[in-house]
Amino acid sequence: MLHSPVFPAFGHHLADYPAMPLATDLPRTPKSSFNIDSILSRTDRPASKVSMEMPSWQPPSPPFHYSYGMVPYPPMWLIKPTVGYPNMAQAQPMRMPRGECLCPDPACKHRGLSYSHCPNGALNPLSWRTGPCKLKRIRTVFTPEQLERLEKEFLKQQYMVGTERVDLASTLNLTETQVKVWFQNRRIKWRKQSLEQKKAKLSQFGVILADSSDHTDDSRETEEEEDDVDVEL
């Protein structure tokens, strides 16, 4: 026991307490090894973090020379819950059925088809704004018996209207519009043939026949009418 001359009891108290351990006696934390085997065998690796970022998406690019206000509406984008995270939403494209062709013309063959399969809607990006579908120009194939009867009626009269045209169409099992278009085309052909024959006769005498303004206007008016009434069959 140690005794202090100044504090006699100091040595007594020092003797009652156990000796403090040295720094060398403290437990040491094992050093971490950074070799491959040690890293692979670790069980305290942090779990991989799941990316919580929302996926970015962009609507489809418009065709060249068209803006988003001019092209048809893109597929609808719906918000669907992400698997495993019901509270988080992810934007995913989902194609909705398109509307049918709204062409009001009863002769349109595309009525009832999906507008995405309509030839006019697929080729023209503005067709859904520009009104009814424009019908293709397809000529009617007449039978020899029908042509013979039509030519016979044309020799009688170049214009057929009213009940006569309706009766002729019913007799030949044709529509009234088909008969009307045939007579219009036949009149144009007859005018061209007559003009060529007239020019051929006058050319024998060295005379060149100029086209008259009345004939040109008449032909132009007939051709424009033909464009308006020609139908798809």
From Swiss-Prot:
DNA-binding interval(s): 135-194
Ranges where the record places region Disordered: 212-233
Highest taxon of the lineage: Eukaryota
Name of the molecule in the record: Homeobox protein not2
SMART domains: HOX (SM00389)
Major subcellular location class: nucleus
Tissue expression as described in the entry: Localized to the dorsal lip of the blastopore (Spemann organizer) during early gastrulation, after which expression continues in tissues derived from the organizer. Expressed in the notochord during mid-gastrulation, the chordoneural hinge, notochord and ventral spinal cord of the tailbud at stage 22, and finally the tip of the tail in the tadpole (stage 35).
CDD domains in the cross-refs: homeodomain
Disulfide bonds: none
TM region(s), chain numbering: none
Compositionally biased tracts (Acidic residues): 220-233
One CC-aspect GO term: nucleus
Subcellular location: Nucleus
GO biological process, one term: central nervous system development
Keywords: Developmental protein, DNA-binding, Homeobox, Nucleus, Repressor, Transcription, Transcription regulation
